[in-house]
Amino acid sequence: AEAQFLDLFRATQEERTELVKTGSMELQYAENFTVDYYEDGYKMLTTLPDSQRYLLVPEGQPVPQGLDEDVSILQEPLQNIYLVASGAMDMFASLDAVDQIRFSGQKQENWYIQTAKDAMAAGDMIYAGKYSKPDYELLVSEGCDLAIENRMITHSPEVVEMLQSFDIPVMIEYSSYEQHPLGKVEWVKFFGALTGK
């Protein structure tokens, strides 16, 4: 009976082929991202200018089978983000999520945000190279789980390919595309969903 139960349990785990959508984040001004919610805490984040999709898998939950190949899998909690899109740092700071950024695309002296300066001074955040020349060895050895880039990275497609070849998902931050000033501000909701805040 126990063996049957285990088989049943295994089948149930393996059969998680589709996500059941429960709703979407309401946005008033932002037009360049969406966040969709699914049963059991899964979230799909989409950056619309490049149609990239990122599935956030809650801690302890399986990665769903049968996903489209272009969906990047992000395992929660994200703790080793490489933040190159420096404009997003103030949003991380306002969410109290700077501790999820392990790698910086700027040196300590170039940060104007005190939380970032302090994190680098303490060694909690380390410089991992600018957008066009990341320190791949450092990122891989320290377990980078996501690179958040700005639009400049589109001029260095080889960097994106290299990061992806090391299984580091690449996300481009498009808040500067927003026409409405409050659309830019609303990107804090995107990063809130990303960091679980």
Where in the sequence are the language-model features?
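N-terminal ligand-binding lobe of clamshell/alpha-beta domains
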Residues: 1-197
